[in-house]
Amino acid sequence: MAAIIDGKAIAAAIRAEVAAGVTALTAEGGAAPGLAVVLVGEDPASLVYVGRKIAQTRQAGIRSFEHRLPAGTGEADLLGLIERLNRDDEVHGILVQLPLPRHIRADRVLDAIDPLKDVDGFHPVNVGRLSIGTDGLVPCTPLGCMLLLETVIDDFRGLKAVVIGKSNIVGKPVAMLLLERECTVTVTHILTRNLPDIVRTADIVVVAAGSPGLVRGDWVRPGAVVIDVGINRIGEPGKDSRLVGDAAFDELGHAAAITPVPGGVGPMTVACLLRNTLVAARRQQGADASPKKGA
């Protein structure tokens, strides 16, 4: 039977490490990390997610600065706020909650964030640093995937990894992180020809395709590790609806280990946001940035 990789427990351990790191930073005479969270509009899912982020931020000893703007806020006004936050020495991390209203170009907003404060890891500078293997701020979900894998894999060198999904948020960066660990990586997507045959070659499968139950039991070889990033709600809202991943969990008992949905990758994203905020604060204050990328 596949071992269940408990993302909730691992995320809790990371949050505890971050809290200890904040205490150590202030004991060294540094300022506690500060995270600015910017929310434009009243999207219900975004409101819930931002509330969760802020609560966990405060529990870790990180100061939070919340900026809620009306849905009609202009792009220029939002860019002006980002510029002020870039100059604010009390703010070490800036997070703009996505999605933004349609009249605001998300790429312009994300590109305006100081790369040193880009705790989501989406700025082109941080993407470039990741691609060449130098220290930057790593996107939170891919970083969380790697930390989960590290709990069940001691040596990544030479392992065959198949990533299903090519997004800039998960697929591409997690592929680069796996390459950094000397895996042999194949990036695929839902239109890839002979996808099941490709997945069957993998020691590690990371699926982030947004397709419920895409990876079937006969796609995965015995002993492989499956990281399921998918979060899909199926069924009628308020009745029999439930969250499922992109892998057919009940068919994958022959895997060595697998993340559940919910309770796998999801909790790691916010935990890694806190981790990135601590790293950003230490770097901006001239302290050792430990923990480093991929550690």
From Swiss-Prot:
Pfam families: THF_DHG_CYH, THF_DHG_CYH_C. CDD domains: NAD_bind_m-THF_DH_Cyclohyd. It comes from the Bacteria. GO terms for biological process: L-histidine biosynthetic process; methionine biosynthetic process; purine nucleotide biosynthetic process; tetrahydrofolate interconversion. Catalyzes the oxidation of 5,10-methylenetetrahydrofolate to 5,10-methenyltetrahydrofolate and then the hydrolysis of 5,10-methenyltetrahydrofolate to 10-formyltetrahydrofolate. NCBIfam families: PRK10792.1 (NF008058), PRK14188.1 (NF010785). This is Bifunctional protein FolD 1. Its EC number is 1.5.1.5, 3.5.4.9. GO terms for cellular component: cytosol. NADP(+) binds at residues 165-167, 190, 231. InterPro entries: Aminoacid_DH-like_N_sf (IPR046346), NAD(P)-bd_dom_sf (IPR036291), THF_DH/CycHdrlase (IPR000672), THF_DH/CycHdrlase_cat_dom (IPR020630), THF_DH/CycHdrlase_CS (IPR020867), THF_DH/CycHdrlase_NAD-bd_dom (IPR020631). Homodimer. One of its GO terms (molecular function) is methenyltetrahydrofolate cyclohydrolase activity. Pathway: One-carbon metabolism; tetrahydrofolate interconversion. Belongs to the tetrahydrofolate dehydrogenase/cyclohydrolase family. It catalyses: (6R)-5,10-methylene-5,6,7,8-tetrahydrofolate + NADP(+) = (6R)-5,10-methenyltetrahydrofolate + NADPH; (6R)-5,10-methenyltetrahydrofolate + H2O = (6R)-10-formyltetrahydrofolate + H(+). Keywords: Amino-acid biosynthesis, Histidine biosynthesis, Hydrolase, Methionine biosynthesis, Multifunctional enzyme, NADP, One-carbon metabolism, Oxidoreductase, Purine biosynthesis.
